[in-house]
Amino acid sequence: MTQDKLRNIAIIAHVDHGKTTLVDQMLKQGGVYRENQVVADRVMDSGDLERERGITILAKNTAVHYKDYKINIVDTPGHADFSGEVERILKMVDGVLLLVDAAEGPMPQTRFVLQKALDLGHKVIVVVNKIDRPDARVHEVIDEVLELLLDLNATEEQFESPTLFCSARRGIASYSPDEEGTDLTPLFETIVNYIDPPKGDREGPLQLLVSSIDYNEFVGRIGIGRIERGTVRQNQEVIVCDYHDPSIKEKQKIVTLYEFTGLGRSPIQEASAGEIVAFSGISDITIGRTLCVADAIEPLPFVKISDPTIEMTFSINDSPFAGREGKYVTSRNLRDRLQRELLKDVSLHVKEVGTDSFNVAGRGEMHLSILIETMRREGYEFQVSTPHVLNKEIDGKLCEPIERMVADVPENSVGSVIDKMAQRKGELISMTPIGSRMRLEFLVPTRGLFGYRNEFLTDTRGEGIMASTLETYQPVKGEIERRLTGSLVAFETGEACAYGLGNVQDRGTLFIAPGTEVYAGMIVGQCNRNEDMSVNVCKKKQLTNMRAAGSDEAIRLAPPKVLSLEQCMEYLADDELLEVTPKSLRMRKRILDHSARMRAASKAKN
């Protein structure tokens, strides 16, 4: 295919603004499916977790044909925790679709990714999605997008980018908000006419920058990247080199070459500059390496991936229930699995501490919780500590990561949200009314947001939307209270029964139901006071002839509060761990024995 018939674009949007749905419709209307083929919704979110949570975690590639053009589309994650993915992906494309919700307008992640795209000089097509929402405010949202482009120092050409109005769910787009579209033709036409075809000398020596990695059990690692110059062929011998490490010059061979077609990849014999391709055969290929030929070794510079901001310790499970539910339980299993994750995920850092513990650093709570949930589903059993922020030294001062947090809340909850943010060292920078709601923007330390999402949902009665993205580093802002309450800790090992739980439920909120197996040192609830309390939930009622069988009142138990993985991570204090197995999530104290725990606490006080 000639270069002028190629277009490479990425889709930028905030979580849940509909980018994966839009790609679905582009695939349908680009003739990727047969007429009678039944297709799942959001077909690009192929991982189980992605489909359940409705978010995109890994950037995916696909291609659609329109007339005689081939449009390579890259679907990027909208969540800031996966922004390591976004930065690399933008290097592969020549333009971006900026997708914005017609009611919510541009959100923090949109800002983060758009900044990266503008810095690379990409052309932008603005797409206002969900125009059929009852609370859509199309004209205001367009003004907000223009303000955002001004804020981010867009060039004149980027500022005058074309705007389209669409409903991705119905698969329609139009040039004006007052017209009703019939299909996505306006979108395809704008992409073809406005985005430049890829540049690159097809006759020169090969240069291919690897921007993404896939893994397949049959062929091993698959490199994905864009050919910047020259032509690559199947079975060709290449030199793998690295811009940051001149000593790396390995001779390798490309075994299979693939192009992206619709939802899959098809093997091809050769591809030239401007194409996005995948290849297998180089077992240790990593992101950021360049493929060249022997007589022209010129590695390409690579986008520096932002540093991780939070860290957790992963270690083998040493609780009394260890090894009961998991398939992979040893430190060797854990090490191998984390090393395998590093092959795919560039923004993850793993460091071994001691014999069976690993410090795992990532871009945010979501980033690490997805890793934990994925490992758990694969049959791993391990335990993790509470997340800690990674500080940096800048000009001799210790600085911590600061996030820009945007919250859309009902008017009657504004006071409590501002109050809670102030307690967490948050600084209110703007407050704008949007319909019957308020949009609040804060600059808040990353550690101030740990454990806040639950409180936020309670304060806004489940109606608030919050999102945050890393903004800058500032000197450490002093102490922030993580949790104001203590835990209810099981005193002995056994099975929780209704009588024992009935005696305890007035002391706080229970996390377990009767019949749950517990061990000494396991957390069974949240205490009303700001200190831990040891409780006996296994206590059975003494049955003697003194008590008539019918004279007792039935025990009334409130239903237990069941915590999700993220809620457990947010709940943990420094002296607590989360035990993760394929079947259970159990929170526990680091020191299980009650007396040893008391001694350690008094020692720490003194």
Show the residue positions of the predicted features.
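P-loop NTPase switch module centered on the Walker A-proximal segment
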Residues: 1-100, 104, 144, 213-216
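Interdomain boundary/hinge elements
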Residues: 38-41, 126, 152-164, 198-209, ...
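Canonical P-loop GTPase G-domain recognition
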Residues: 123, 133-193
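Short glycine/threonine-rich beta-strand-turn micro-motifs
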Residues: 167, 353-367
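Conserved nucleotide-binding/hydrolysis modules and their immediate coupling elements
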Residues: 207-312, 322-324, 485, 494-544, ...
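Helix N-cap motif at beta-to-alpha junctions
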Residues: 231, 283-284, 362-368, 411-414, ...
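Long insertion/accessory domains within large nucleic-acid-processing enzymes
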Residues: 260, 265-268, 399, 444, ...
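A short, contiguous, amphipathic alpha-helix enriched in charged residues
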Residues: 319-342, 554, 558
